[in-house]
């Protein structure tokens, strides 16, 4: 494209400096962005463009060499701007531990009753837990039984069992008066004596068939023996006939 067409074309547009924004990019130094601005148009020249590109290449060359020499990779903004990123906003960075300790001490000094209130709250919480864990809250199954009602089976001594057996053989059924006398003599309650006699009568009924009399088994044996004798006599008669 010849200069005849290029010069009128660039004359219609503004120069590059007028179009440059007021802010600058952190990736490039301010000196590179403003003093060596690229000017296009009739007033521009090729050496100016080469000079600016030379500065940019030098900047990136030095910046990358500094980054490679350091132990970690840094942001180019911190290298090209004011150097230290902690001083960019106008204050110096403080170590976190010391800052935290200072804040903690300041809060303690500012609120002296904080520690005492915390101790009181912890003591109240422990007291509340102790109250909840106290045996005052008892469920029905945790309550002890009444002294008159004992759970489980009653165990009788050999002497008590012997005396009760004697009384049972004498009379399986006890009157109220006799039950009181036996209970006082053996150190038992009327209910215990009554239950023992009931169980003993059930045991006797299981051992002895209640539907038959005590001599019923003997009668059955006699009948069986008589039937056997009759069968033998019939066999002897048949042999004699033959």
Curated annotation (Swiss-Prot):
DNA-binding region extent: 149-208
Biased composition (Basic and acidic residues): 206-220
Family that this chain belongs to: Belongs to the Antp homeobox family.
Protein name as it appears in the record: Homeobox protein Hox-C8
An annotated Gene Ontology molecular function: RNA polymerase II transcription regulatory region sequence-specific DNA binding
Residue spans of biased composition, Acidic residues class: 221-242
Protein task: Sequence-specific transcription factor which is part of a developmental regulatory system that provides cells with specific positional identities on the anterior-posterior axis.
SUPFAM superfamilies reported for this sequence: Homeodomain-like (SSF46689)
